[in-house]
Amino acid sequence: MAIAGGADGVWKTELSDDGGYLEVTVGPCESDATKTCGKISSAFTNKGANPNYKNLGKLMVKDMKSDDGANYSGGTIWDPEKDKVYKSKMHLKGDILDVKGCVSIICSGQDWKRVR
């Protein structure tokens, strides 16, 4: 972890409309360890684990920068349900990661919960 107390770890997304969710492993980007990325590490339906989820291992959060380990910006987030990429910002509040995707000045977000 580059900054103590940063967003590194495993995060659970909010539930989708059908009750599923993803776990995203956040840490230094492979291409540039000074930036933060997040890969989809697990997927769950409303009935349990989904090991055949087609997007396992794909980057969801890419190239986020932080000077303080709590506020992240300058990167993107990929929405696998819509297959769209948005400018992104994140704010760490204890074990909650407020993740936002933005189009122009309009942002929409989720509160992800730290799993570990």
Write out the residue ranges for each language-model feature.
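Sec/Tat signal peptide C-region and signal peptidase I cleavage site
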Residues: M1-G6
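Central antiparallel beta-sheet cores of small beta-barrel/beta-sandwich binding domains
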Residues: A7-K87
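Short, solvent-exposed mixed-charge patches
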Residues: V115-R116
